[in-house]
Regions:
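Class I SAM-dependent methyltransferase Rossmann-like catalytic core
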Residues: 14-64
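Acceptor-substrate binding/catalytic loop of class I
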Residues: 46, 163-183
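Class I SAM-dependent methyltransferase SAM/SAH-binding core
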Residues: 52-111
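A short acidic, Gly/Pro-enriched loop at the edge of an enzyme's catalytic core
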Residues: 108-121
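A short SAM/SAH-binding and catalytic strip from SAM-dependent methyltransferases
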Residues: 119-132
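A short glycine-rich, Lys/Arg-flanked "PGG" loop and its adjoining helix->strand segment in the class I
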Residues: 134-149
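Acidic carboxylate diad motif detector
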Residues: 152-154, 158
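Conserved catalytic loop of SAM-dependent methyltransferase domains
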Residues: 191-210
Length: 210
């Protein structure tokens, strides 16, 4: 409700008279007063990583959509856990060698996966690992049935999980809800795109620390 000039004046006065709250210099960072994270593996060594709490809450809220023929990346764990009336569970993996995989391929270029194949695709924490996310989303759209549902999650505030030269692939993007909405609505349309975000300042800090 305030003009830019008024806001700048108030900010200048707060700095001049040290009117910040909490007072500048009084915050106790406790166990976060460190330059390396508490856990190097997102907290898997200490329990359930915080992002998985939100991911699983999201899937739990959408169990009615995890039905019919479903596709998941890596393993069918979430299909098994949250699916209702699943008739077939397929697993996609990027490279050969995964014994659970029923389909091997790159979602940015996967002509061997037929159109209109799946009622539901669970696509968690992977979009940020794909150099061309729009191409991957176009494939997901193509291989979904006309009334199918894609349940997609991706990292916002998080440490980098994959590095080229150390892992098989890198991590290229961290999305905001706005950017993910933008590229999803380009493909599905505004009416068919629903975006939500999870977390707060404390959970973001804790997730970075593991």
């Amino acid at each position: 409700f305030l003009s830019d000039a008024t806001r700048q004046k108030i900010t200048a006065l707060r700095r001049k008279h040290r009117l910040h709250w909490p007072r500048a210099g009084t915050i106790d960072f406790g166990g976060f007063d460190r330059l390396t994270p508490v856990s190097q593996v997102f907290g898997y060594d200490r329990g359930l990583p915080i992002d998985r709490y939100y991911i699983e809450a999201f899937l739990q809220a959408n169990t009615r959509d995890i039905t019919g023929r479903c596709l998941e990346l890596g393993d069918p764990g979430y299909i098994t856990r949250f699916g209702q009336g699943v008739t077939r569970a397929d697993v996609l993996h990027y490279v050969p060698g995964n014994p659970l995989a029923t389909i091997v391929g790159d979602l940015t270029d996967a002509p061997h996966i037929p159109d209109n194949s799946f009622d539901c695709i669970i696509f968690t924490q992977t979009l940020q690992m794909i150099v061309d996310p729009r191409a991957a989303l176009r494939t997901i759209h193509r291989i979904l049935k006309p009334d199918g549902v894609a349940l997609i999650t991706s990292a916002g505030i998080a440490k980098i999980g994959r590095k080229l030269g150390r892992d098989d692939w890198g991590e290229y993007w961290h999305f905001t809800s706005q950017s993910l909405h933008l590229i999803s609505a380009e493909i599905w349309g505004e009416a068919n795109t629903t975006i939500g975000s999870y977390g707060n300042v404390m959970s973001a800090c804790s997730f970075l620390q593991g």
